[in-house]
C-alpha cells in the first residue's frame, strides 16, 4: 500500500515553496513519501519522486491549480494527499491517513481556520452557499485514491479546470462569476456534483489555516497583505509562530513573501538533522 503527498510547482518561487513544504511534511511525518509534480526537468533532494504532467494544456494557465484535474493520473501513490505549494505542515498525519483510507475515495475539507484556530466564515464561498445551495469545500489540501469513484471526480474536474470561465458563466449569475481562477469554488462545484460523499464526518478532518481567507474576510488589520501587519517567526527546530500563536496545523500562507531563506534554512537543516 503506497501513500504519499503530491505538490505542484512550476515557477521558481513555487519550487522554493514546494521544497519548504516537503521538508515540513518530513519533519512531522518522518517516513512520508513526497512527490513533486512539475513541467520542469530538475532534481531536488527534498522529494522522493519527481513526476511530469501527463497532459499538455492548450488553455491559458495563469494558476497552477488549473492543473488539479491531472493529479489522479500523475500521482505515483495509491493514496494521496495533495497540498498547495504555498503551505507548511506542522502536524503529524498518522491518524488522518488511517481515517481517509478507511472512509473515503475523495475527501475535501469543509472548514478553514485562522491562525488563532477560529473557524472562518469565508464570505466569498458563502454567497454560493446561500444563492446556489452549495456546501463549501476547500481545495488547498485534499485526499484521493485510485478508485473508480476518485476517477469520476477528476474526470468531472477536468472541464471545470480547463474552461472555468465558461463554467462559472453557465452556472452563476453574472455578478457571481470570478475574474480570476478560484480553486476553492471549482472544487466546491465538483464536490457538490458527486454521487458519493466527499465530505469528512468531522469538520476538523483535513481542516487547515487559510491566511488568504482570513485576510479577505476582513478579520485582520488593514494592509496590502497580512504579512505587512503581522510577524512570523521560525526556529532552528522548525517551529513556527504568527504573532504569539504557535502553528500546529497545516498553514496555507498564500503570499509569496512568506518564503524567505531563514525559514527555508530552519526547516531544511532540521530535517537533515533528525534524519541523520
Model-flagged regions — what are they?
Residues 1-59, 178, 246-276:
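N-terminal anchoring/stem segment of glycosyltransferases
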Residues 18, 22, 118-120, 184:
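Short, highly selective alpha-helical patches that border small-molecule cofactor pockets
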Residues 35-38, 81-84, 89, 106-109, ...:
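A structural signal for short, well-ordered beta-strand segments and their strand-loop junctions
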Residues 41, 75-77, 145-149:
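Short loop segments at secondary-structure junctions
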Residues 46-51, 129-141, 145-276:
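A glycosyltransferase accessory/donor-loop signature
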Residues 62:
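Conserved phosphate/oxyanion-binding catalytic-loop motifs
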Residues 67-118:
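GT-A fold catalytic core of metal-dependent nucleotide-sugar glycosyltransferases
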Residues 107-130, 269-273:
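A short, conserved beta-to-alpha structural element at the edge of catalytic cores
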